[in-house]
Amino acid sequence: MTVGIVGAGQLGRMMALAGYPLGFDFLFLDKDARTPGGQVGPILEGALTDRELLGRLCERCDVVTFDWENIPVEALQGLPGKARIAPPLRALAAAQDRLSEKRTFELLGIATTRYAAVDSRTTLETAVQTIGLPGVLKTRTLGYDGKGQFVLRTSADLDAAWEALGKAAPLLYENLVPFDREVSIIAVRGLDGAVAFYPLNLNVHRAGILRLTRAPFVNATLTRQAQRAARRLLEHFNYVGVLTIEFFVSRGKLIANEMAPRVHNSGHWTIEGAVTSQFENHVRAVAGMPLGSTQPRGHSAMINLIGELPAREAILTQPGLHWHDYGKSARPGRKLGHVTLVETTARQRDLRSYKVLGRIDRATWLAIR
């Protein structure tokens, strides 16, 4: 069986590396052959919206999946070829537009932020008056890792917010949630409808970018809330593959922030830290194979390597640290790799992950100590 992956970033690369031992072949489509996926598999080089190339991908593959959710759904509809597309395009469309995403959460009874659609300076002012301050003005599409956002703390920020993002209208305004922590859940649903959940991840962001994930985050009440929300989304979309939901924890309850219809950065710890990684389970699901166990092997942490890589030797000399280099060129704010560790207790994990974080990302370490 050949699995096609639209996008050849690090997520696609890790999917292929997880799928080769299962006996699958992989074919990527990406605008640049010099990508992480290009290190591990052949690439059809061209625009992700090129319907001719997408059609060739579907003709050469048995199933097609994604490592990025912002591929225009219109380009993927009605393609020739034998390939099934998973996850379903309805889920992709909902995740691409923050307004559709919020409405989906509301439809399914999943608590989320208060929000309003904004398409002009006047509707922004109305939204601020209705929802209140502080709040966040966001682009409705192509927002990730903190991009396309402006925080308003007083009414004096209205002009600056519109100046910054007005040209990208339509937009979304939502209240700024006072939260205690951020968590995510990674769920997977097979072609046969079987569902499995990984334990909750406890996440630390700085400047809108994930810096540190620890798992499992043990909280029975929040786990039930997260699994209930994920199951509703999986069933609503008749979903196949891995789905991630990010939440704020506010006053003991979960507030859904966003969903990602793909494998997720907060699940990278599963490569070493779970019986079956999120990447292997995604491949299993879209290929119609039985799902693997999502049980953790211990207490794990994942630290992102952002902007520049630390000295590799300094990491590799420490027992139990796992180094993942995506082979990308350095650039401020860019995810270049990650480091993981697995310990026998949560305390050991926390102590060691803070120590490693202090060496790799001192600004984040100072912010959370």
Predicted regions and their residues:
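ATP-binding N-terminal substructure of ATP-dependent carboxylate-amine bond-forming enzymes
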Residues: M1-R103, L107, T122
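Active-site nucleotide/adenylate-binding loops and adjacent lid/helix of ATP-dependent enzymes
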Residues: A94-S184, V188-L233
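Short, low-complexity Ser/Thr-rich regulatory SLiMs
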Residues: A187-L191, F247-R251, G327
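A short linear hydrophobic-aromatic micro-motif
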Residues: R114, P134-L137, A169-E174, L243-T244, ...
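Peripheral (often C-terminal) accessory segments that flank ATP-dependent C-N-forming ligase machineries
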Residues: R284-R369
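Active-site "cap" helix and flanking loop/linker of ATP-utilizing ligase/carboxylase catalytic domains
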Residues: R224-I245, S250-R251, A260-E308, R312
